[in-house]
């Protein structure tokens, strides 16, 4: 009889474990519920100015000439016939020098259309004796690089990147834009690039780089959403050595109601001079969620996550309007999820050691009134290098191991799209979509979660999670610029968001999140940003508010530099 009773107790415990994992709000990646650092937007880290040619003197433009011969010199990179035939119809005609210059400008446009950034044609000073007209084509290139400001130990990296520009003769716009924007991948740097037009007919000019470097920075993101106040503080070092490294350490304070501890380290080093960046990331997290739907208050839950990862990213496309960044990463993750009855001591322990390879593409398109971003990733788990999973049920002094439902060889795909637009009357809109799909039951660290700023403003951070899910948000805003020293921008907005999650082992609760919100953002465009909003849940009831009461959210970010 006792054996049968124990069997039923174990089956009941297993069922309870499945229900708990299917319904608890924190079953997803716990890092998704941490405060975010949203530093004020300071503008691009790289600005470019290519100085135009000096205009011709107006008093010369009306002078008449009848060409008998055109002598075109300096053409090397474009078929000569394409240049000379532009001037042939002018032979024997009474024209002005202004018309000659207009034709030469057409040659300049031809070079620009072919992608030669510094090349141009002009009519040099001459007597036009016997109707002979000289046309000079300057195929421009950068012969020298002048670095000013505070490059520090990063100057060697800067010059190595600039060497790609000086090596391209004549300089093509694609080369120029790619490597000037590669400066922006160096940590802590702000670069202003200026290229004066060539002053000699050989086409040589100087690339002037004004560099500002922030060697250290401390930033913080503070949330008032949990409930209580929590902040993620990050200290960063940028390029103190010639390696051009960036080292940062982050910590969560205080532990808060869920007794969370989180510490992370990140180190990145540029490799070569073409934009390749390697990165090492390590983090450890521990928390005891207090809101666990479907479980009595006597059950205590403990979540642990440790992660170590290596990645390499490379800009496949990089210019002034668009970029495409490819990233390959591999990481190992250790996860523990424990449910324990505080009265009886009975417990359910789920553990996993995950080994994952992930590939990701990040695309950005920027125009005067619109910014688009698209991120796509595919991840595959492998049962190698110590990967494992286990689930233990302890009743009294007896511990029984059962099969864990999670997959170590899972496949996970995801995508995120955002678009912001600026319309007349300073009206702005923002649309964001995200989704994740997996045909497998995922380990804790691989699940997708929603709540608060993640597509559910009316809910707590990490309110719900699942193996698959999607979210969307819409926002309409209107920016005001009072121009005050400590408040450069005020942006009121209204927003709507919704999210859905799905599990292979059950139905999460809540699973259908929706909310409407009204809020305002403040920033000085340098040091701080403050986001305040009131959000009303209109989907499933939140774990902490069955009446769907409005929720006040506040997020504050600050950086020293």
What function would you assign to each model-found segment?
Residues 218-222, 247-251, 278-282, 326-330, ...:
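Membrane-embedded beta-strand positions of outer-membrane beta-barrel proteins
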Residues 18-22:
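Sec/Tat signal peptide C-region and signal peptidase I cleavage site
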Residues 507-561:
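C-terminal beta-signal and terminal closure region of outer-membrane beta-barrel proteins
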Residues 1-9:
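Bacterial N-terminal signal peptides that target proteins for export
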């Amino acid at each position: 009889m006792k054996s049968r009773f124990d069997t039923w107790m174990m089956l009941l415990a297993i069922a309870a474990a499945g229900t708990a994992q299917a319904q608890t709000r924190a079953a997803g990646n716990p890092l998704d519920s941490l405060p975010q650092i949203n530093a004020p937007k300071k503008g691009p880290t790289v600005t470019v100015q290519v100085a135009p040619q000096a205009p011709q003197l107006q008093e010369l433009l009306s002078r008449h000439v009848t060409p008998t011969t055109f002598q075109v010199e300096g053409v090397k990179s474009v078929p000569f016939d394409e240049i000379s035939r532009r001037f042939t119809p002018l032979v024997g005609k009474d024209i002005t020098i202004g018309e000659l210059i207009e034709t030469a400008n057409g040659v300049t446009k031809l070079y620009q259309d072919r992608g030669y950034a510094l090349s141009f044609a002009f009519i040099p000073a001459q007597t036009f004796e016997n109707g002979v007209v000289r046309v000079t084509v300057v195929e421009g290139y950068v012969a020298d690089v002048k670095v000013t400001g505070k490059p520090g130990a990063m100057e060697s990296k800067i010059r190595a990147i600039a060497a790609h520009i000086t090596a391209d003769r004549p300089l093509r716009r694609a080369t120029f834009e790619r490597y000037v924007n590669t400066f922006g991948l160096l940590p802590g740097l702000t670069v202003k690039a200026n290229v004066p037009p060539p002053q000699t007919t050989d086409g040589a000019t100087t690339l002037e780089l004004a560099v500002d470097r922030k060697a250290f920075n401390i930033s913080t993101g503070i949330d008032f959403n949990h409930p209580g106040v929590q902040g993620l503080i990050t200290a960063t070092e940028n390029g103190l050595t010639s390696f051009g490294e960036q080292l940062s350490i982050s910590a969560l304070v205080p532990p808060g109601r869920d007794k969370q501890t989180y510490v992370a380290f990140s180190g990145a080093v540029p490799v070569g001079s073409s934009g390749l960046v390697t990165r090492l990331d390590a983090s450890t997290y521990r928390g005891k969620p207090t809101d666990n739907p479907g479980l009595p208050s006597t059950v205590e839950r403990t979540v642990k996550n440790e992660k170590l990862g290596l990645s390499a990213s490379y800009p496949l496309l990089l210019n002034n309007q668009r970029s495409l960044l490819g990233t390959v990463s591999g990481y190992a993750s250790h996860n523990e999820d424990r449910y324990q009855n505080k009265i009886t001591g009975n417990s359910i322990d789920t553990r996993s050691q995950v080994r994952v390879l992930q590939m990701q593409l990040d695309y950005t398109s920027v125009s005067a009134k619109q910014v688009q971003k698209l991120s796509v990733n595919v991840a595959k788990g492998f049962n190698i290098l110590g990967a494992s999973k286990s689930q233990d049920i302890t009743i009294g002094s007896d511990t029984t191991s059962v099969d864990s439902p999670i997959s170590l060889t899972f496949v996970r795909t995801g995508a995120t799209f955002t678009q912001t637009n600026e319309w007349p009357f300073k009206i702005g809109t923002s649309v964001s979509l995200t989704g994740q799909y997996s045909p497998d039951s995922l380990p804790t660290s691989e699940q997708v979660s929603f709540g608060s700023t993640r597509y559910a403003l009316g809910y707590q951070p990490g309110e719900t999670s699942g193996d698959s899910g999607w979210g969307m948000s819409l926002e309409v805003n209107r920016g005001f610029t009072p121009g005050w020293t400590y408040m450069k921008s005020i942006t009121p907005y209204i927003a709507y968001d919704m999210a859905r999650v799905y599990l292979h082992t059950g139905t999460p609760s809540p699973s259908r999140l929706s909310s409407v919100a009204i809020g305002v953002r403040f920033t000085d465009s340098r040091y701080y940003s403050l986001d305040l909003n009131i959000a009303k849940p209109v989907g499933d009831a939140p774990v902490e508010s069955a009446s769907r009461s409005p929720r006040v959210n506040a997020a504050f970010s600050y950086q020293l530099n």
